[in-house]
Structure formats: C-alpha cells, structure tokens
A protein has these predicted regions:
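Helix-loop-helix "hairpin" substructures at the membrane interface of multi-pass membrane proteins
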Residues: 100-109, 115-120, 124, 171-246
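Transmembrane helix-bundle core of multi-pass membrane transporters
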Residues: 127, 131-194, 220-223, 242-251, ...
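Cytosolic-side transmembrane-helix boundaries in multi-pass membrane proteins
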Residues: 1-35, 212-219, 293-326
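Transmembrane alpha-helical segments in multi-pass inner-membrane proteins
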Residues: 232, 242-308
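Hydrophobic alpha-helical transmembrane segments
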Residues: 23-28, 53, 60, 82-86, ...
C-alpha cells in the first residue's frame, strides 16, 4: 500500500532530525555541560571570560581548520602539534640568537611549517602512503629537529612588536581574535565557495568519481596538507607571542584538541563532510568546556579523560550516521 504524503513528510522530518542529532548530538550534550558549569560558576559566561576564551582558542582554532581539511579528504594530520614547536624554535633562534627582524623570523618559521606540510602531502599523494603513518613519522622528525635547533633550551623573546601580536588590541579587540576571524572568513570562502573547496569534498566523498570527472587528487592532497602546515605555523606565531619564549616541547597533545573540535563540529572521518561554521562551534565548545573545568577546579587528569570521551562520542556518532561510507 502506498504511503500517504503526510506519512512521507513525517518520515522525512524524522530523518532530518536524526541526521542533525547524529551530527551535532555530542555538541548538545556539551552545551548542557556548559549550562551546568555556568550554574556552578557564575563567572563562566560573563563577557570578560568569553573574550578570554575566544582569545585562547585562536591557537586551537587554526589547527582545527587544518585538521578539518585533512579529515575531509579522508586523511589526518598528526604533525600540527609538532609544527607548533618547530615554528616556535625557528622564530626564537632567528630572532633571539641571530637578531633578524621579527617579521622575517615569522616568515621563516611559518615558511618551514608550510614546507613540511607540502612534504606530507607529497608523500601521501605521490606514493599513496597512509596519512596516519606519514604524519606520525613526520611528527617524530619535526620534534627531533626542534630539539636540535634549540638544544632543548628555551629561548626568551623580548621583541615588543612580536609579543604584542598576542597582547595588543585593535579597536578594543585582542589581536588573536582578529587573526582567527580573518582566517575563519578565508577558510569559509575557500572551502564552501571555490572550485578547490568543491574538489576537497569530491576527493573525500568518492575519490574514484572525482578522478574520473577530472579532479587532480594529487594537487588537492598536496594543497590540503600545505594549508594545514601554514595554519600550524600561524598558530605557533600566536602561541610563541603569548609565552614570550621559544620551546621545543610545546604543542604536545594539541592535535587531539584540534581533532576533537573538528569532529565535534561535524567533520566526518568518512570523508567528504565538513563545514567551517561547524568547526567554529566545535572550537568554542571545546574551549569553553576546558575553561569551565579549570574554573571549577577539575584536575587536568580528569580533563584528559573528558577530552578522550568527547572524541570517542563524536566518532561513534559519525560512524552511526555514515556507516555506509565507512
């Protein structure tokens, strides 16, 4: 017996609700957690604390965008935390020891991070190596180089222009927030409004169909990992400006925060599914949750447990909603 139009509409609405819950269900749970934290700590949702969180999440936000692109193509980039350290060490060495102008130091550091991203993409695209293996191995290489460059010692930076990148404000808005907003706009336009963005979704959604339609998988993959390296370099610039020191041991575990924010924002490990607005939501939720747990005195050990559970929950929902693609 044929279904009535009302029945079809009801089924369609149920599917739509199920899809939304599947994509953002873990986010809803975390929003409830934020409400509970706000009740426990009245300062949590004050404008001052929100601005503080927005300033701090700029670093993880830039890393998240790189992970978003890599995951959307069906890959992963585990080097972003190590890239923070390497870029920081290059900036510190060229500025603190060689006396280069601050701007050239930033160009050198971010340039090296971008180059390593290019190499990652080249190895993955040219030799069909697994992204996990390539980026995990390169993570070790980059960490080692960071230690070699600095000898494991911190390099203090006193250049006021450079340290002002984190501490200065423009029209009353902290510079890290301005940088994050500008990069967010660029990433949104690139991913959702350009041919390259469509190619990223095509390669992640069905690589064989993408190649058959004329899309160059090679340049898409190389481009994605190069951009991820560039964003990691910019994130390191902000981080190093914040701390006023270049260190080889920074960024450990930062890739997991970026992955959590990306997946929480709806980026699918199945590939071909992602939105920049979703990433922004994930970035803010992760930042607010960590900030809230700090404010109510939750141990860092328990915070690590929460972080792991968030990633597992988000990936489980992703697997359920995209079981056919997986």
């Amino acid at each position: 017996m044929a279904s009535s139009p009302q029945t079809k509409r009801a089924a369609s609405n149920q599917d739509r609700v199920r899809a939304l819950l599947g994509q953002y269900g873990i986010g809803i749970v975390l929003i409830i957690m934020m409400i509970v934290i706000a009740i426990m700590e009245p300062r949590f949702l004050t404008p001052g604390n929100i601005i503080n969180v927005a300033t701090q999440i700029s670093i993880n936000g830039l890393l998240c965008y790189g992970l978003c692109l890599a995951i959307t193509t069906g890959g992963i980039d585990l080097t972003v935390g190590a890239q923070l350290a390497l870029t920081s060490c290059i900036i510190g060495t060229t500025m603190g020891k060689l006396g280069w102008p601050a701007f050239l130091c930033i160009v050198a550091g971010v340039g090296v991070a971008t180059a390593f991203g290019f190499v990652d993409g080249l190895l993955i695209a040219k030799f069909n190596m697994f992204p996990f293996v390539v980026t995990l191995s390169m993570q070790l290489v980059i960490r080692g180089l960071s230690q070699v460059i600095t000898g494991g010692q911190a390099i203090m930076l006193t250049n006021e222009w450079f340290t002002g990148i984190y501490s200065n404000k423009f029209l009353g808005i902290p510079m890290p927030i301005i940088i994050f907003v500008v990069v967010t706009i660029i990433m949104y336009l690139m991913l959702h409004w350009t041919r390259f963005g469509r190619y990223i979704f095509a390669v992640g959604g069905n690589v064989n169909a993408a190649i058959a339609s004329g899309v160059s998988r090679f340049w898409v993959i190389v481009g994605v990992y190069t951009i991820s390296g560039l964003l990691a370099g910019l994130a390191s610039m902000i981080y190093t400006s914040k701390t006023g020191a270049a260190q080889s041991n920074i960024g450990i575990g930062y890739e997991t925060d970026a992955i959590a924010a990306a997946v929480l924002g709806g980026t699918s490990f199945a590939g071909g599914i992602a939105t920049i607005p979703g990433c922004v939501l994930g970035i803010f939720i992760i930042g607010l949750i960590y900030n809230g747990m700090n404010m109510i005195g939750v141990s860092s050990y328990y915070q690590s447990i929460v972080k792991g559970l968030i990633i597992i929950g988000a990936v489980m929902l992703d697997m359920v909603m995209n079981r056919n693609k997986h």
